[in-house]
Curated annotation (Swiss-Prot):
High-level lineage: Bacteria, Thermotogati, Deinococcota, Deinococci, Thermales
Gene: rnhA
Cofactor note: Binds 1 Mg(2+) ion per subunit. May bind a second metal ion at a regulatory site, or after substrate binding.
SUPFAM superfamilies: Ribonuclease H-like (SSF53098)
Residues annotated to bind Mg(2+) 2: D14, D139
Protein name per the record: Ribonuclease H
Domain RNase H type-1 per the UniProt entry, residue ranges: 5-147
GO cellular component, one term: cytoplasm
NCBIfam families: PRK00203.1
Biased composition (Basic and acidic residues): 131-144
Family: Belongs to the RNase H family.
InterPro entries: RNase_H (IPR050092), RNaseH-like_sf (IPR012337), RNaseH_domain (IPR002156), RNaseH_sf (IPR036397), RNaseHI (IPR022892)
Amino acid sequence: MNPSPRKRVALFTDGACLGNPGPGGWAALLRFHAHEKLLSGGEACTTNNRMELKAAIEGLKALKEPCEVDLYTDSHYLKKAFTEGWLEGWRKRGWRTAEGKPVKNRDLWEALLLAMAPHRVRFHFVKGHTGHPENERVDREARRQAQSQAKTPCPPRAPTLFHEEA
């Protein structure tokens, strides 16, 4: 007896940041046939890349069973990590870049891998701000979330005596 086929779900994601770092927001739109679920959140002090990753993580975590997922993003950072082998290289080098520096956002990359594990995920690039309806929708919600976080500005960065590695 064959197992039942996985449900095919579309996941549209976006992240936004007012300043980089600054207040940020993320949004994920899940679609299964006529059913939709919009998820969103924000952080007071973050980066645009962290919000892009958070959107994908939260969208995948919301799925209640293993699915075939078409993930649509306007983030080259997110898509290329998988489609151009960046992530595989980072892991082989012990979470270091080709230049030997620690990979930024490792905590979220690891969380994303865990969230992806039960699913089959295909990444699709959508050019942002070109009228793609779902991308525009998650962009608006991510920006709204970022603006709602703007009441708490990022603390100033402490001066350092050393060059930063990351």
